[in-house]
């Protein structure tokens, strides 16, 4: 019966194909799907969570756009406040909770990510749920800066505002209703946390993490040591552990129902590869808290668009976030040890005294198991593999050499009847070819060829159809994997066919070990110097390659000693030479070993043995020598050696060969000495190399692809995603490389057809669709002095012009497209919007802004929307070399105003809103070179901004300030009347396109001012 694990073509093809399919298919299914509501989820449902209630809440808060600068935002806030009160009352938890309706906090600071000096007036909602170990009463009134309050609390946070162009179901409606459910769960009798929990619903995250900055003024801030931030950067799908500060807090997430995530995402933020941010950045970077970012992350094409609604998410997605949040908060609040208490390693007393964290490494397996361990442990592991691995393999190779079985890296030796010489000093010895180097350089050559194929494909797609990955990422994956597989197989199989080598597997393993060792060196340096843990893939890989290579080296022990093989080879050569030189020598010369082990004895025919025997008997007419010809010359070297064997010895040898076990023959032309070599160990090597690496590489590859495949429209690199998939395809197929030369042609030829089909598709298919729409960024500007208005669409010019071509008000216009000032590698296309002017006050009930039917707004209307009054100026030239002016700014139906100062004038050195708190240094000092933009946010809709600004004045230069005041309008709920240009673009854009905001304000109205 044939060995099912033999190193033969059929078996290798079958097992490698089955294993890859059995792993890759589930990985894709898990990446695309969302876990169902687990039956054991009823434990949470019975104890406090209510999925139906959460889904209804989500529908209520996402009925309309609710940007912070919209009236609907107030409606959502009022609804959330009511729901909090209802939940607390239903659980009879008034005595265990305190609701904070923040209408007083304000912060003046350097806004995160923009370096723009900003004033913001907060209106967050948050609930303190008292823990069993917390102090009684309203202890926060007596809290002092730097004082440890109890054992530290836990923050769970989500923002309830949306962007101006989205309903915010995923960003961040599901996080918001999850916070409501956390309040419901932990206020239910029997669920009181051990340490207190602060449930925060913050406002104005979208314009720049403003709500998190305002929370810095909360009396509860010193109490919070850890946090769970809930976010959404897609539209439904799975929620992923976006990032985490350390191993200890990550352990609180490790036993959730359906864990999903990798430390690779966290390292992407740490290295600055991800340019966007969440409230996590404020909690950790500014306040020093330790925690996690749990977020939805795909599909990004629907992010910040009107398709971020309940239609494009699911109850399963919501349940996954609710269940994961509950488990994580239970674990964080139940930790009463010293993990989150103690002095900080950086000694910063302005931040939470939450102990010394340790870096971690984490990843999930098939979305069901979570692996977590320390980075320092992995560093020690990495060093061990780097040092012990090569030493062990060198030691084993030395033992093989000492055993006389070192065929690898030896091409020949000279053999005599009693000795073998590898140095060739015995000139009388016969040269025995070993073929030791045969096949050594196949792997790097095949890797270069296959790598060139996928790199060329990446460059071709970048040039011909750069956005195809936007909607067809799996076609790109299929093309890259198929191309690399076929290219690599073609070289390896072709080389093996023309020059078979029994050392092929060993040499490929050696190359894999060398490449893995180099990669591990870089990964280890990153672990030690930058605390980057993403190299865990290479740590596992090199460990697996080391073991597989060790097996390959051990296989050499099954070979005969080189000296024995050389003697046998020399004897067979001598016998063969003598048979050709001496007449009828087969009657007196022993047969070769091959002849002895065959069913037909030398000189005996299977058809007529008696007749053959008679023909072989010499008589007086038999010539002494055969006729001259090839092989009939007497081998004088053979005679010189004087080698003779008796007839009895010949017969004994024949009998032994016939009665004993058959000698294993080399595989299809491989080296003659390789017959006894153990080869069935290949399946062990493949299992060491393949499955775990495919799981790790596949999961990371799919996660990264989902994260970056739709970022090109934002101005990110168009080539990087293709090169990433090309590299990951090579990594995924590396476990197959030692065995691919035994794969039959059927799989590679099928994959060649797949590669050809997907390449053609990727080159000619239109890259966008209603399910993966192209995203353009809208902004309308109005000169409030003249009434001139323009629409600016940011994006890729090729597609912008197609979109604008269908916009009625832009027909017949010459469209100007220039490099975007705010988005890298994109353009701003501009057209006149006089036919669709904005009317921000439409429906506001303000009679002074009513327009007669059919009358378009002009300078008289726009001039009343924003006023800037210089209250006074004060010169301090003699003492400080500066001037100060007080400005009063009024804007209609907006909460936000910007002051943009001319570049020709002096920059602003400081500013302060009258009645507000002073500058908050936690976010950074006021820019040393001054500022030319100030941004002001108010809590209500009517109050005036009164601002003191200071600028430097040179000795003889007393020039004043010039600039433009800009009012931002963001409420698109009645866009057909208030923002008809925006409504027009949304309505007439092709089905394959969608519209998002380009800035916090959809409409920017500016007016000149001078001080």
From Swiss-Prot:
EC number: 3.4.-.-
Comp. bias intervals (Polar residues): 595-609
Active site feature: 205 (proton acceptor)
Intervals, Cytoplasmic compartment: 1-9, 400-439, 493-505, 558-682, 741-747
Source organism superkingdom: Eukaryota
GO MF terms, alphabetically ordered: metal ion binding; metalloexopeptidase activity
Family named by the database record: Belongs to the peptidase M28 family.
Annotated positions binding Zn(2+) 1: 159, 171, 231
Organism annotation: Pyricularia oryzae (strain 70-15 / ATCC MYA-4617 / FGSC 8958)
Protein's name in the database: Vacuolar membrane protease
Region (Disordered): 595-627, 650-671
Enzyme class name: hydrolase
Annotated compartments: Vacuole membrane
Residue spans of biased composition, Acidic residues class: 610-622
Residues involved in Zn(2+) 2 binding: 171, 206, 304
TM annotation in the entry: 10-30, 379-399, 440-460, 472-492, 506-526, 537-557, 683-703, 720-740, 748-768
Cofactor(s) essential for the protein: Zn(2+)
Gene Ontology cellular component annotations, sorted alphabetically: vacuolar membrane
PANTHER family: METALLOPEPTIDASE M28 FAMILY MEMBER (PTHR12147), VACUOLAR MEMBRANE PROTEASE (PTHR12147:SF58)
